[in-house]
Each structure stands twice: as C-alpha cells, then as structure tokens.
A protein has these predicted regions:
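Central cavity-lining transmembrane alpha-helices of secondary-active solute carriers
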Residues: 50-66
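Helix-loop-helix hairpin linking two adjacent transmembrane segments in secondary transporters
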Residues: 139-182
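Conserved MFS/SLC helix-loop-helix module at the cytosolic interface between two early adjacent transmembrane helices
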Residues: 61-93
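Juxtamembrane intracellular "pre-TM" segments in multi-pass secondary transporters
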Residues: 1-4, 187-217
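Short amphipathic helix-loop junctions that connect adjacent transmembrane helices
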Residues: 28-45, 233-239
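Cytoplasmic helix-loop-helix junction between adjacent transmembrane helices
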Residues: 105-143
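Extracytoplasmic gate region of multi-pass secondary transporters
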Residues: 26-27, 214-239
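Paired small-residue
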Residues: 89, 100-108
Length: 239
C-alpha cells in the first residue's frame, strides 16, 4: 500500500508552499518599506530585519500550541485552519499603507504558522518504520526548497509586477495548499494524547533541561542565523 507515500508527498509540497509564502518577502521587503515611506536606509534596514524576523520568531513560539490543537482536533483540520488564516493575512499585506500595519500582519502570520511540527508528526505517524529516515530526509529537503525558492519567486514577481503583487501570489499559493489538504489528505488522529494539564511553557522548559536538546537548539539557531541573517539587508546593499 503506497497511500502513505502520497500523504508524505502532499505534506512536503505543503511545506514548500508554506516556506515560500513566509520567507519569500525577504528579497524585496526593504524596497517595499521604502514605498511605504521609509526612505532612510538605516530605518529601512532596521524595519526590514524586524518585519522579516518576527514571523519565524512567532512560528517558533506558537508551534507547541498548534501541535496541541492537532492532538485535540486532528491534524487535517488544524492545518486547514492555519493555511486559511495565513492566506488571508498574506493577501492583506498587499493593502498595507504603513510599516506598522505590515509588522502586525507579519506577526499574525507567525502566530498561525506552526504547521511544521504537525507535518513532521504526520510523517512519523503514517510512515513504516524502515522508511522513516527517507521520509524525514524528504521533509527536511522540502523545508530547504521553501527557503531557496521563496526569495527567488518573490524577487521575480516584484520585479515584474511591483512590490504588492507577490503578496497576492503567495496568498493564492497558500490557498492552493489548503485545497490540497481538503481534497487529498484523509482524517488522521494521533495515537498519543497530550495531558491537558501540562502547559506549553512547562513542556518547553522540560525539553530545554536536556543538555543534548539545548546543544541541538543552539546549533540550529546559529546555522539559520548564518544562512538568513543578511537576507533583510541584502537588497539595500545591492541597491
């Protein structure tokens, strides 16, 4: 039975689309901020860093909450809800008139962006034990593809159609991902129920109390910092 493979391919495709949506603005966000009234390059660089970084930050903070909801409601329903709200907030960015409005919407995108651990949990749930390394590798590759193709896609669309057009494109892409979940993903239920009396903060504290987990988190932070740190200011430097 290869039905589990179809679900994995779907989850990985959703991950690519979601990654493109969240990270794709990096290639043009400083220039868009100038269109919103920030003509000083120093201010534009600062706001670009804040606007670009707040979304991944909120994704990291909100992921435990959405993972818990996936245990309660089922991963299919939660992922559809996340993608629907993400579609609305990304599309709304095209109508922003001030940097603060853009920052608020980017923050909301991060709050509802915690679909990565849900996808990972689905893969672990449905994949045969001897195929888990392959499935995990494919999922990690899809995350990298989103990081690679997002800025490229955002920059190309912004160059051709203006700085507001990519938000419409990313919103439509998120909508397609949501429809893919609706039509192609079966209803699944995680086998292990989470103790509702345990808060997300206590769970985070527990995992961070493990030395190897702290080391892994630190290494991942430094790697991602090195890869994406220059992204918000690179368009200004090239300009």
């Amino acid at each position: 039975d290869s039905s589990w493979k179809r679900i994995i391919y779907l989850i990985c495709t959703i991950q690519v689309g979601g990654g493109i949506t969240i990270i794709g603005v990096i290639s043009f966000i400083p220039l868009f901020l100038a269109e919103l009234g920030l003509h000083d390059q120093g201010q534009a660089a600062m706001w670009a860093g804040i606007v670009s970084g707040v979304t991944p930050l909120m994704v990291a903070l909100s992921a435990p909450y959405w993972s818990r909801k996936a245990n309660q409601w089922g991963p299919r329903k939660v992922m559809m809800l996340i993608l629907f709200i993400l579609m609305i907030t990304v599309g709304a960015c095209a109508f922003t008139q001030t940097p603060m409005q853009l920052l608020i919407l980017r923050t909301l995108q991060g709050v509802v962006g915690g679909y990565v651990p849900i996808g990972l949990a689905i893969i672990v749930l449905i994949t045969p034990e001897n195929k888990v390394p392959w499935a995990m590798g494919l999922y990690q590759a899809s995350m990298v593809m989103g990081l690679v193709f997002g800025p490229l896609m955002g920059g190309l669309v912004a160059d051709l159609l203006g700085y507001r057009a990519p938000f419409f494109v990313f919103s439509a892409l998120t909508g397609i991902c949501m429809l893919g979940i609706y039509f192609l993903m079966p209803n699944l239920q995680f086998k292990h129920k989470v103790d509702e009396s345990v808060s997300e903060i206590s769970l985070i504290k527990y995992f961070l109390s493990i030395p190897r987990v702290r080391l892994l988190v630190g290494m991942l932070f430094l790697c991602n910092f090195g890869i994406t740190g220059i992204g918000p200011i690179l368009p200004l430097y090239i300009k």
